[in-house]
Every structure is written in structure tokens, then in C-alpha cells.
């Protein structure tokens, strides 16, 4: 990172599932604690895979988090002594998240968000592309393709071991039993078989 002499900026950590997004968010939050900075972490209520009140990485690292239902609920927890605001699984938040993040950065907070940049179909996911556009720093992580071992930038949704159809629901919170990382060439999204 570059030396920043002003307070308030946005960092986006994005990539496919199993690329280390939550792990990187946790690492950055822990570094702020060593620097005696005050941080708060948020997560959407919908993300309760491993814990209701922690952000937990797939490898078991965790940090306490405040679950919120709507983006603007974040404001209720912001205090002046905070330096850093971190938000995990940002793709699951409503459309107001972009404004919330902008307001917080403009008020002088370092805002770190992490989330999927593409849905299981390989299309831009939620508000993440907008957040990437307004961020000062974007870190795009890759996993390893579970089929061929190449760098994986996509998330494959599997239903009973088979790729999910294009028009299946976008949001379905799961872990390794329903998703795996894939490269561009091994990623498959068939048309709906019912049509």
C-alpha cells in the first residue's frame, strides 16, 4: 500500500470463493489492532454459515462482527473513536451499501470491504463493481481451480454434484458442499433444463 496522509479511504478485497477474501479482511483488521487503532467489523445477517457473530474464514480464522440486516443499520454502530470499519460479504448487502461506504470514507474512516465480484454465473455481483470503481485500493484474489489447478477467478455452484443452471437463484449461502473455485475454462453454467 501507498503512504496515505489523509484520513478516509475505501479498500475492496474481492475474488472467487475460497480465494482468501475473509482471511485478508481479518488480517487487515488484526494489523490495525497492533497499531492501537479501533476497528469494527460488520457482516450481513444472511451469512450465518460458521457463526452468527463472527467473520470466519474457510481456514478457521475469525474476528468478532456485528450482524446487520440493512446497510444503513451500520450507522447505528459508528462512534468517533473508530478508525477502521470493515464489512465482509458485501455482495449480500442492499443497494445502499455504496452510499454508506462513501459517507464513512468521506467522514475520515478507513473502510475495508470484502466480497464476491462475480456471481456463480460469472456476472458482476451486487454492488461490488460499483465499490471497486470508487475505491482507492482494490485487491483481487484468486483461488486454485478445483478441476485443473489453474488460477481460479470464478465460483462454481454445484447442485447434487452438477453445475447449477443459469437461471437458478443468485443468492444461496453455502460453503464447500455447494461451491468450488474454477478457472474461466472449467467454469460451467448450463441453460435451465426445464425450458
Swiss-Prot record:
ATP binds at residues 15-22, 88-91. It is an enzyme of class 2 (transferase). Its EC number is 2.7.1.21. InterPro entries: P-loop_NTPase (IPR027417), Thymidine_kinase (IPR001267), Thymidine_kinase_CS (IPR020633). GO terms for cellular component: cytosol. Zn(2+) binds at residues 145, 148, 183, 186. Substrate binds at residues 120, 170-174, 179. It catalyses: thymidine + ATP = dTMP + ADP + H(+). GO terms for molecular function: ATP binding; thymidine kinase activity; zinc ion binding. It is found in: Cytoplasm. GO terms for biological process: DNA biosynthetic process; thymidine metabolic process. Keywords: ATP-binding, Cytoplasm, DNA synthesis, Kinase, Metal-binding, Nucleotide-binding, Transferase, Zinc. The active site is at residue 89. It holds the Pfam family TK. Homotetramer. NCBIfam families: PRK04296.1-1. Belongs to the thymidine kinase family. This is Thymidine kinase.
Amino acid at each position: 500500500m501507498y503512504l496515505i496522509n489523509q484520513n478516509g479511504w475505501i479498500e475492496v478485497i474481492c475474488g472467487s470463493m475460497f480465494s482468501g477474501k475473509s482471511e485478508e479482511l481479518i488480517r487487515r483488521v488484526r494489523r490495525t489492532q497492533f497499531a492501537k487503532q479501533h476497528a469494527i467489523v460488520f457482516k450481513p445477517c444472511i451469512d450465518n454459515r460458521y457463526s452468527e457473530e463472527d467473520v470466519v474464514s474457510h481456514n478457521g480464522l475469525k474476528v468478532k462482527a456485528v450482524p446487520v440486516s440493512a446497510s444503513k443499520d451500520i450507522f447505528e454502530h459508528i462512534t468517533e473513536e473508530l478508525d477502521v470499519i470493515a464489512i465482509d460479504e458485501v455482495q449480500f448487502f442492499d443497494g445502499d451499501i455504496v452510499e454508506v461506504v462513501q459517507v464513512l470514507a468521506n467522514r475520515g474512516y478507513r473502510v475495508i470491504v470484502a466480497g464476491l465480484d462475480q456471481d456463480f454465473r460469472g456476472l458482476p455481483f451486487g454492488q461490488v463493481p460499483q465499490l471497486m470503481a470508487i475505491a482507492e485500493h482494490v485487491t483481487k484474489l484468486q483461488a486454485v481451480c478445483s478441476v485443473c489447478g489453474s488460477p481460479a477467478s470464478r465460483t462454481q455452484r454445484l447442485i447434487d454434484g452438477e453445475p447449477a443452471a443459469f437461471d437458478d437463484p443468485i443468492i444461496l449461502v453455502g460453503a464447500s458442499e455447494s461451491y468450488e473455485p474454477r478457472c474461466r475454462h472449467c467454469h460451467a453454467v448450463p441453460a435451465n433444463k426445464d425450458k
